[in-house]
Amino acid sequence: MSDIQLYLLEADSSNKTEAQGIAARTASRLQQKTLKLIDLVTSLEPHINDKDNGSIRANSVAYLADVIAALPLKVLSVQERRLLCDFILGRLEGDTEGVGASARALVALEGLGKWDTPTAQKVLRAFLDNTHPLRQFKLQTERYAVVQLIDLLVAKYRDAMRKLHNDDHEFMAGFISYWEGEKDPRNLMIIFSLLQVPMTEWDVHAHAQDLFDSVFNYFPITFKPPPDDPYGITSQDLKNRLRDCIAANSDFAPYAFPQLLDKLDSTSMNTKRDVLQALQACITDYEAKTINLYSVTLWDALKFEILNVQEEDLAEEALTSLALLAAKFSYFGEGPLNAYLRPIIKECNEHLEDAPTKQSEAAGRILHALVSSAPQAADKVSKGILPVLFALYNGSESITRRRGLLQAFNQITGGFEKMTGEIPGADCKALQAFADDALAAMVRALVSAPKAEVSFRMASLTGLAQLVSVPGLLSDKQINQAVDTVTNLVLHEQLQGHGDIRTPAIKALSSMALNVPQAVRDRSVPAFMVELPDVPEGDVVPSTVLEAFAQLAAEGQIFDTVVLRLKNKLRSVRHQGASLAYQRALLFAMLYAFTFGSPARDDGVIRSAYYADYADPLTIDFVKDVSSETDPVAVDVVGRIANIILRPQSVHLQSTVYHKAREWLSPANADESGASQHTTPFLLYFYAAMRPEVVEAADVVSMLKAQTVSALSAWASSQAVVTTLRLVSLLVNKFANPKTMQATLAEAGLDVEILTHDSPSAEAIQAAFAVTKGLLIQGKSGSLTTRYLQTLLDLLSGPNSTTTAQNFTTLLAPDEILSKENHCLISGLSQQKLFNQAIPTLTTAIRTATPAQKPAYLTALTGLLRHLPYTLLSPSLTLLTPPLLQTLDLTSSTPDQAAKASALIIFESALMHDAPILTEHTSSLITRLLNSTSTSANGAGVRAKALQCLALVPRQLKREAVVPFRREVVRRLLACLDDGKRSVRGEAVRCRTAWLGLDEGGEEED
């Protein structure tokens, strides 16, 4: 069989891949000269001219298209390509079967060599004359190929296509009507795109309405893509293309604006959004002289969306449209701008006379949008509004009226702030003329207005910050007055509850620090220092002043000033022997500044000089200085500050710091100086900051040995032990070599199997869990971790089972130290590994354990589950439900309360996501939940959570399963309604309502 016959056979059976392979082989023969083009065309004749079968004719053309598409460049000569082009176009005159394949063949031919102008014009003419309208072809794939071809012609042969239009006045009418009725989104995406070429580049004035109508017929787009749409075309894609068409030519304005504004009255919010976005595109792209004809009409329509807000985003879009209009006219001429702004200013002034109202608030938003658009608009709005606004303000004694006017003024100032930020050096003289009046009014409001007038004072505070933020608006004297007013507010206003505006005042002062940092340094910082004496009277810590001062560090312009003053004050305080609480407060302020402030950065990394300037001196004062007055809290805070600065630094800088500190940090020196215990909090954060490659292996072993001694010491404080164990987990996770892990642990005295051998102490058990936690999260020592986990599980059957069980919750408990930010090794499979090994062992042991052993296993199980995601537990819920129910029977001790809380959280998730699994346990679950609501054996947290779970039961489980328990549940919930805790009583009310809703046969409960 010939290639064409094979192709037709495969095409008929819809085996597209095999058919294309046959065409590719034909193309290869053409390339190798074993087949001549004339022979190829001749072989097509009996099939391409088959009068009885249109499918064969179409597939024959498709074969030719696939062959041409598979040909490399330079195989066909110019003459051969021209002959093929004529052959394909000639077919269209008498037979349009396979029109899509014809289009594909022509696209492939064009890819082999660019056409000349006559050829390109002839191709377009042939399709417009012989396939008009395109919608006559029912298959989208055929229309799509034609659309792609014409898009290619319009994009690559712009001059040739424009010449067709210029030479034939009837061409455009046919071109426009060619696309009528197309509905497929893939085709429309290309059609909207190709139509923009004549819309923007050709003279289409005579055809503007037809061209506009051809696309506006699709407005608004209501297309919703089907699920799993392989083409990825969204409704927004179509909207964007259509919007570009509507805004493509100013000649469309007489048709676009009336029709868009008519659709703005639609009750559909989506239609309104599309209209407003289309209006914005038109305003942006149409010529200013054209838009000028419609400016007042547009204002009348847009103001409705702002003055009568239906949806907030619609109001924002309308405001954006008004701003675009103002910006357009600002650079076109004074006449159009005046004509546009005059009615707006008049109406806004009228609304301000009635302030405060929703309309006056909307007027303020309108003024903000106009002022922020351009300097020219800002100047005219200010001159038209501000005289009236301040006349109204000064003529009124009503604080409410003044507040509304001040809020409108703030909108104008905010507009200037935005505009000057986008256009540096913009003129603000119109606003400057009223700056003194505004400043005086705001200062007077903050100082003299009744404290209960919170909104009035807040408006004044906001206004002061905005006045300062507008470049060049205020004189130095005025800036100082504004800064002093806000500073005094922060420092001296002591009002609590309603009327307290210190927090926003601190934010306002931070804002001023951004815009006028020198004024804040010169005025505010000294004022804060006055309120921070070296030795406070009566040892009263000025905590509110410190909190406010530390928050100023959020602004990078004065960060260095804030932390330097805090450091110097801390030194003075220590020198004067002030209270430990005061020193702590200053340290916490520095920590806050470095944590939440804006320190200087080099290449995105916090500046390394901060370590030498701040962390190092603090370390010398609070960590290296060993005395009876050493404060573990201060040591901890200094460690945190050092961690923040060191953590992102390079290996080189960290190595320099580490080797400098290595001598005094070494365990031997620490023991000699007596610093071993009190430096541990610092060591924890110091080593957390270090990259793994910085610390030497020998140092790791010696440090682990020292921590082993501390961890196993029965005399150490509980907090010191916790810190030591966290450090052990960190050292094991990050610095110990996984290849020599067991040897390292054995040398340090931390081998878990040895630690737990022969009735281990509580301290040894805790150390074993700390080591295992570091290994588990690391995930690099799999077999060793498995052995250690099994060793810990075996301890649950020993004499120290209670202590062991309580420690299982630590294995996956979150720890800020063990994080990727601290360069730790974090395995994504640690939770899964622990679950797979521990949970089956524990559930099996619970089934066979004696009553005395069971509480330990239940505590261990819930301790592990507490920190596992529900998605990990869900597949094993059937296995876990019985032991979790037994957990709810535990006694009232503190560990048991934690176990109960963990079980209840899991039941809550199960009821919400996997309720059918719990159906068979309905009776046991309800009984135990009711028992957990009693006050005698359960804490308030457990009681509240049990009630939350109980409330889910009638909603999530089958009605017939829970109705029998309704009467008993409602009766026992009466006691919960008298619970001593309000939170529990609230949950009891909600739970009882849920159960009463079951409506058991119309019976009513008392």
What does each model-identified segment do?
Residues 2-52, 56-841, 849, 853-860, ...:
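Structural marker for long, regular alpha helices in very large eukaryotic proteins
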Residues 864:
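Phosphate/NTP-binding elements of NTP-utilizing enzymes
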Residues 954-955:
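Charged/polar low-complexity intrinsically disordered segments, enriched in acidic residues
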